[in-house]
């Protein structure tokens, strides 16, 4: 299953970007033996629409256009369900085992995700009840994708 991360907005060079790249590099090495191929990060420009609803709709359209038929979609959203790392790994493993060829993990912009995109999502995931800056959300999902691969592989990185 090809795994991509779509993020609204750009991440500037710096230590946060380096940490994200480090975890995605680890994931790209750990994933293939498990049937998980990291396809990279796609940065979606923030909409310049006049209202939050218009901005969310435009950003959702860009994400929707990238989805293959039958692709799995995980949205990071504060209204989502908080999962532990093992449950998150299990969900990814089940998506892979169910024959999904593509998984997109989407990080929304400052206004969040459009309700229609939340309805389309296979999983709406919250990173806890706290609000996180975009850069930290990227770090967290990069680390959790790597952690999920190690859990699925039975590697000792994750200690429950």
UniProtKB/Swiss-Prot annotation:
Keywords associated with the record: Cytoplasm, Methyltransferase, rRNA processing, S-adenosyl-L-methionine, Transferase
Gene3D superfamilies: 3.40.1280.10
Enzyme category, top tier: transferase
Binding of S-adenosyl-L-methionine, residues: 76, 108, 127-132
Catalytic activity, EC: 2.1.1.177
Listed SUPFAM superfamilies: alpha/beta knot
GO cellular component: cytoplasm
Function: Specifically methylates the pseudouridine at position 1915 (m3Psi1915) in 23S rRNA.
Subunit structure: Homodimer.
Similarity annotation: Belongs to the RNA methyltransferase RlmH family.
Record PANTHER family: METHYLTRANSFERASE (PTHR33603), RIBOSOMAL RNA LARGE SUBUNIT METHYLTRANSFERASE H (PTHR33603:SF1)
Protein known as: Ribosomal RNA large subunit methyltransferase H
Organism: Brucella anthropi (strain ATCC 49188 / DSM 6882 / CCUG 24695 / JCM 21032 / LMG 3331 / NBRC 15819 / NCTC 12168 / Alc 37) (Ochrobactrum anthropi)
Organismal lineage: Bacteria, Pseudomonadati, Pseudomonadota, Alphaproteobacteria, Hyphomicrobiales
């Amino acid at each position: 299953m090809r795994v991509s991360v779509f993020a609204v907005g750009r991440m500037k060079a710096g230590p946060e970007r380096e940490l994200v790249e480090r975890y995605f590099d680890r994931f790209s090495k750990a994933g293939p033996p498990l049937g998980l191929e990291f396809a990279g990060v796609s940065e979606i420009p923030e909409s310049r629409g006049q209202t939050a609803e218009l901005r969310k709709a435009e950003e959702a359209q860009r994400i929707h256009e990238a989805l293959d038929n039958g692709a799995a979609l995980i949205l990071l959203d504060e209204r989502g369900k908080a999962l532990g790392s093992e449950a998150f790994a299990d969900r990814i493993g089940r998506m892979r085992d169910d024959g999904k060829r593509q998984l997109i993990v989407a990080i929304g912009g400052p206004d969040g995700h459009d309700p229609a995109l939340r309805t389309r999502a296979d999983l709406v995931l919250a990173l806890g009840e706290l609000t996180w800056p975009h850069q930290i959300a990227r770090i967290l999902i990069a680390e959790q994708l790597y952690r999920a691969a190690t859990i699925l592989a039975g590697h000792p990185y994750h200690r429950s």
